[in-house]
């Protein structure tokens, strides 16, 4: 990555509250980047991305296993409701637009224009290319969220997203190509099993955004767990011992042959 591009990305992450610059040398003055509390809390989303790619994406390489240090076993974590403890998936929740949100979603403005071609996840060095195809583009994430909320028809995607027909058509095509949406005979778009499997990522992104960027007491989107009729507070549970996972008690185990590469 060119230094100029890296500098822009680091600045954006600082502005978003994910990184903070900390001086570590005074002569000459130098700074290092450290994760904030909001940045550290992204670990739950990263595990969701890892788990989805492990389950649904054919890869030329093998992702490292996740180990739960408390039980010492490799885990395939399970998303659960923090209120009742039950396992939860896309079919177990009802999305509701909160007082701080609207179905007429609009993506935040971009300060630097980037073409659709430039945003294609074609770089073989990308660790999670299909996830980047969904989350790496602002409109793709909006369209997939709307599909999860029950939007089916093209005109409804266009109206709810507040995007141009060209943008909506392009993102629907990309999401269909990735395999998270399918287009039926009647022209409606529905989520595939692969798309429904992306629910933990969406749920944790919503939870993180409300926790660190939302207005106090005014959620933009609420996820109601039908099992307990409460608002979903997603947590990860170890599928081996059942305990709730904590950031400092899990780690990825790299292949010894790949260390230092």
Regions found by a protein language model. Name each.
Residues 17-18, 179:
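Glycine-centered, phosphate/nucleic-acid-interacting loop/turn motifs that mediate DNA/RNA or nucleotide
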Residues 41-59, 197, 201-215, 220:
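Short, solvent-exposed amphipathic helices
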Residues 21, 183:
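Short beta-strand "wing" residues that participate in macromolecule-binding interfaces
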Residues 1-14, 162-176:
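Short amphipathic alpha-helical interaction segments
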């Amino acid at each position: 990555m060119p230094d100029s591009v890296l500098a822009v990305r680091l600045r954006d992450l600082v502005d978003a509250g994910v990184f903070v610059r900390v001086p570590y040398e005074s002569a000459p003055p130098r700074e290092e980047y450290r994760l904030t509390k909001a940045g550290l809390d992204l670990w739950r989303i990263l595990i969701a991305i890892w788990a989805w790619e492990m389950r649904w994406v054919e890869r030329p390489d093998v992702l490292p296993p996740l180990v739960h240090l408390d039980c010492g076993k490799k885990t395939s974590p399970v998303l659960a409701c923090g209120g009742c403890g039950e396992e939860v998936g896309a079919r177990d929740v009802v999305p509701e637009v909160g007082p701080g949100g609207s179905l007429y979603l609009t993506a935040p403005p971009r300060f630097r224009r980037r073409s659709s071609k430039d945003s294609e996840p074609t770089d073989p060095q990308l660790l999670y290319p299909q996830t980047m195809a969904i989350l790496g583009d602002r409109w793709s994430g909006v369209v997939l969220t709307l599909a999860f909320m029950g939007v089916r028809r093209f005109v409804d995607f266009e109206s709810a997203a507040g995007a141009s027909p060209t943008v909506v058509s392009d993102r629907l095509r990309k999401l269909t190509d990735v395999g998270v949406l399918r287009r039926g005979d009647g022209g409606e778009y529905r989520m595939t099993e692969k798309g429904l499997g992306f629910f933990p990522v969406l749920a944790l992104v919503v939870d993180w955004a409300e926790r660190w960027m939302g207005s106090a007491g005014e959620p933009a989107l609420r996820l109601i767990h039908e099992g307990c009729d409460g608002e979903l507070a997603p947590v990860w549970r170890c599928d081996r011992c059942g305990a709730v996972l904590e950031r400092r008690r899990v780690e990825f185990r790299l292949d010894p042959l790949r260390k230092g590469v």
